Amino acid sequence: MNDFTPKFRIGNGYDIHRLVTGRKLIIGGVNLKHPDNLGLDGHSDADVLTHSIMDALLGALSLGDIGKYFPPSDDKWKDVDSLILLSKVIDLVRKQGWEINNIDSVLVAERPKIKPFVEIMKKNLSNTLKIDNSFIGIKATTNEKLGPEGREEGISCHSVVLLEKKE
């Protein structure tokens, strides 16, 4: 063991949820309309963007994943707004003396189009995290009809977070 404490930590997060009927389609705290009236299946609101960011934040500090803190076996988290969960995760991060340097996320979905909603997603996330929205990058792509996203069986998100130790 040494006494080295890094100034930066990076975390990677990933989430995917199945598209189903009878559920809302919440991404980045925005209720989107799928052309086939599909939503994301999950214990909470199944917000893949917010979930992948939470996992990236937790992973950067080796704190486990969101299932450790908000297990699907606990009815307390049933249908909960994922932005509420994100606020709890960022509190954990800040209690350890870290701050977000930046977030970069890629949503993978054939439909609906995500780009028109990116700015409001960034606003929702920046308000929850209490950071400038310029620290958040959100991109969207299709999977070119390949894999579960391409077959419109689900929507996924990859996120990377860079944390900086505060003095």
From Swiss-Prot:
Protein EC: 4.6.1.12
Record flagged with keyword Metal-binding: yes
Catalytic reactions of this protein: 4-CDP-2-C-methyl-D-erythritol 2-phosphate = 2-C-methyl-D-erythritol 2,4-cyclic diphosphate + CMP
Cofactor note: Binds 1 divalent metal cation per subunit.
Domain of life: Bacteria
Annotated site residues (Transition state stabilizer) in this chain: 43, 142
Any one Gene Ontology BP term: terpenoid biosynthetic process
The protein's enzyme class: lyase
Alphabetical list of PROSITE patterns matching this protein: ISPF
Similarity section: Belongs to the IspF family.
Oligomer status and interactors: Homotrimer.
Protein's UniProt name: 2-C-methyl-D-erythritol 2,4-cyclodiphosphate synthase
Lineage: Bacteria, Bacillati, Cyanobacteriota, Cyanophyceae, Synechococcales
